[in-house]
From Swiss-Prot:
Name of the molecule in the record: E3 ubiquitin-protein transferase MAEA
Catalytic reaction equation(s): S-ubiquitinyl-[E2 ubiquitin-conjugating enzyme]-L-cysteine + [acceptor protein]-L-lysine = [E2 ubiquitin-conjugating enzyme]-L-cysteine + N(6)-ubiquitinyl-[acceptor protein]-L-lysine
Positions of the record's site feature: Essential for ubiquitin ligase activity: 314
GO biological process, one term: proteasome-mediated ubiquitin-dependent protein catabolic process
InterPro entries: CRA_dom, CTLH/CRA, CTLH_C, Fyv10_fam, LisH, ZF_RING_GID
Domain notes: The expected RING-type zinc finger domain is highly divergent and most of the expected Cys residues are not conserved. Still, the protein is required for CTLH complex E3 ubiquitin-protein transferase activity. In addition, the conserved Cys-314 in this highly divergent region is required for ubiquitination by the yeast GID complex, suggesting a direct role in catalyzing ubiquitination.
UniProt superkingdom: Eukaryota
Start and end residues of each stretch annotated as Extracellular and involved in cell to cell contact: 1-124
UniProt organism field: Gallus gallus
Single GO MF annotation: actin binding
Function, in words: Core component of the CTLH E3 ubiquitin-protein ligase complex that selectively accepts ubiquitin from UBE2H and mediates ubiquitination and subsequent proteasomal degradation of the transcription factor HBP1. MAEA and RMND5A are both required for catalytic activity of the CTLH E3 ubiquitin-protein ligase complex. MAEA is required for normal cell proliferation. The CTLH E3 ubiquitin-protein ligase complex is not required for the degradation of enzymes involved in gluconeogenesis, such as FBP1. Plays a role in erythroblast maturation and in the development of mature macrophages.
Gene of this entry: MAEA
The protein's enzyme class: transferase
Amino acid sequence: MAVQESAAQLSMTLKVQEYPTLKVPYETLNKRFRAAQKNIDRETSHVTMVVAELEKTLSSCPAVDSVVSLLDGVVEKLSVLKRKAVESIQAEDESAKLCKRRIEHLKEHSSDQPAAANMWKKKRMDRMMVEHLLRCGYYNTAVKLARQSGIEDLVNIEMFLTAKEVEESLERQETMTCLAWCHDNKSRLRKMKSCLEFSLRIQEFIELIRQNKRLDAVRHARKHFSQAEGSQLDEVRQVMGMLAFPSDTHISPYKDLLDPARWRMLIQQFRYDNYRLHQLGNNSVFTITLQAGLSAIKTPQCYKEDGSSKNPDCPVCSKSLNKLAQPLPMAHCANSRLVCKISGDVMNENNPPMMLPNGYVYGYNSLLSIRQDDKVICPRTKEVFNFSQAEKVYIM
């Protein structure tokens, strides 16, 4: 029964932690399937049109040259259809194989062989680190770690490298790469009600104002803002007011609109939409796992000012993680466990807690082990007491 519960808990942990591992390649497969369907439907309609034209021509006793020309057109369209179909199927097959490879990898966690299970845990840790490094912008380090660990097909490097290109273009104050990304994911972004493309068009308008190309800015507004409504319409009205002010104005809100820091806001907006598009959280799995682990073992003893109650074996008590865990909640413990300061053993009915006259509590077995001539020395205060002075503690 305990084994079944442990397996169920592990399965639930995998579902929570490994969701991005399967979701990202699945979304890529889904996207390629839809693109393939559109391409094949489009090319099929082209073939149907030229075949219909050929049939219409044949019904009126045409010249041989015109028939040959139409047949060449049919052959050309069929060749294009075949090429597009092969390319689409290959792309889908690659994504399907990647999904299968990751599923097989996740199944390895239930191996009965300790060595295989430990290897799988190491790979999972490496995968978490690679994703965290990619999120932090350490792309070269992440790629090297993935290559050395042999997990290149188990992490979402391609997605983050694509995002890197978009973010770098926005840092250069260019919008074309990000707009192309919006076009590639147009249907999904529309379902998400993303306003990233609108924000990019607003920024293009602002840059035209900055360059004093006001007629171009008006043409740009007519082309891209004619369908604006709701809150977007209010924003359009605001930026249109920039036409009446010089590009170096100090009047709000136009001064804020001309602030180059808006490009950093666009990067943050793209990053947010990119994570939503692939159904990823704002924090990496590594960060979430680390915070959950620290919170699970965090106690008030880890933050005593005198430092006397800190445990050298406790990660939260360590200098590097103590500050990191400070804003996290304390461990939830329905049933307290008393641990002896001397031996580290749990104090229970077989090792009852004993309180010395100075108020410090130790396990009975530990006091026996340090007793000399019926005397015990408190490890904390170095005070000496008779063994008989120790009193049993009862927890209500």
